[in-house]
């Protein structure tokens, strides 16, 4: 039951009065189409918020700020108990545009790199990225200015639902792609037992995630034999290269900054990876969390 509760959380509401402090934030301004109110859309993956008691400076609450979420306050703002600070889509991971411009798709070919399905709730047709037999095609969305210059590029991961059409004009902060989240993991103890055994025997999971070993900036290399090369470069110039199968969902984009231990692809993180990167305490926390899930 715990996993399904986590999956449907969609906001952070303050339980305290205090001052909001935010670290590592990259965000773009956006306007709510319905209410006309301004908010920020978070485009960094390492942002973290704290609510601090203004008098004692004691930290009352800390929370990661999910990528793609809406942020309704700024760093240093006074927060009242009951204020909704952040909201996100509980059912979909998203890719949002960091810039305004026109969208151009690359390698988006029907029945080769995507299929069309009707959404059950809206009845609208959607383009869903599929595993391509043609390994040279890597679907991507480019945001271009009026002269056709590339402003920003986004890889389209497997299973992504593309919510824009070629040539659409997009504003900074708009959602380009939705990726349905897996709601609930093991479901109950019987479904989760194989995973528990896997954990305690420290076996590597059947579908391991690719994890960055260093803090650094993400870049993409070439496609090699059905794998996408991901290159992480640290501030000191250390470079780590990882190969991710094209059948896996890549969770990062070009120029993202990641910390050691950040998964670059979907799948279960192996206890061995966590031990090597973050040490024994982190492994204990991870095993407890995984068993509870």
Regions found by a protein language model. Name each.
Residues 1-293:
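Intrinsically disordered, low-complexity regulatory segments
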